[in-house]
Amino acid sequence: CAVTFWELSSWRSGQKALWKYRLALAAVIAPLVVYKIGAVFDQNLMGFLGISYITFKAIQVIIEIRDYLIEDMNFTDYLYFLVFFTPFTSGPIDRSRRFTEDANRRYTASEYADLLARGIMLLLVGAVYQKVLGTVFHHYFTPAPLGDGPWWQELGAQVKDAYMYGFYLFFDFAGYSLMAMGASYCFGIKTPRNFRVPFLALDVRDFWDRWHMTLSGWFREYVYIPL
């Protein structure tokens, strides 16, 4: 938080030094790097739940300050954006300006009732995805060891396992994302959708445009396009 507001105050005062921008980025990325290095060596040097997503959010804000997309920001709004708990562990990754607009919006009773109803529906659908469908596919995903049977039987078993595991991953992850969306809606935050029927994709690129969309969009906006 401190380095982000230090960069913001520098940009507002006209002190647009590139080294400050780079230092701010390094400061927010460093804890994640230390945590990942510790994980490799099985040492919990510096880690906590949701550190990756907090890092992505902080990087996003710093880049948008540099690009003049954010000219002013309330400290409370920024902290709320970073630690908003419903998508804390696995996303979806929201955008700070969109999130802040929702957080500061005053809903009428009827508007909030509609939002709450949609949130509850998303929670229920997400629970079915994760707890029912995900469990079913996980139960039937039984990796078959390679044996001495005919090659086509072995190949068929491996293909079946690959499909079962793919569907299990989808329903487990998409179910969590839907529940995170639903809980967010109940708090008045319209967290964006994370999956859009990826198994109906026409090619590999289309698949990744439909799978974990907020993460792929984040990399596209803040990594690939700037490079």
Residue ranges, per PLM feature:
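Membrane-embedded transmembrane alpha-helical bundles that form the catalytic cores
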Residues: 1-227
